[in-house]
Amino acid sequence: MINQDDFRSALGKYVTGITIVTCNSKNGPIGMTANSFSSLSLSPPLVLWSPAKASKRHDTFLRAEKFIIHIANEDQIELCKSFSNSADGGDAVNWEFNNEGEAFIKNCSARFECIKYNHFDGGDHSIIVGEVKKFETTDHKPLVYWGGAYTKL
């Protein structure tokens, strides 16, 4: 049997980017900090992310037909921490809205506006695949996660 703490520690040796995934809910926009993001396909343009099933926000994201994945910039540590603790991001977030009424966060390194393409079971997580309909990039350096902590490049 694999020790989960040791497994998590080993996974922490892999540097990942940090994202904030947002969607609209019946109570307004919500978000979740996630490092389980990956590109999947160029044609069609697909990305994926994996929310934990134990999260109170999991089911809302699983039902969402649209969502936006934000690549956090190196100055957005507090924003990422806020979304780790609160669905609405607390006072740290200033919501903006696109033409379709979807909430997003400005000044990220990149932003991918997606429609849900599919979802799959992934153990204690779900795997949500999104088809990218629009994206935007900036010159901001991304925030990264390594060894269980946020860090800069």
Task: Please report, for each region that a protein language model flagged, where it lies by residue.
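Basic, polyanion-binding surface patches
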Residues: 1-153
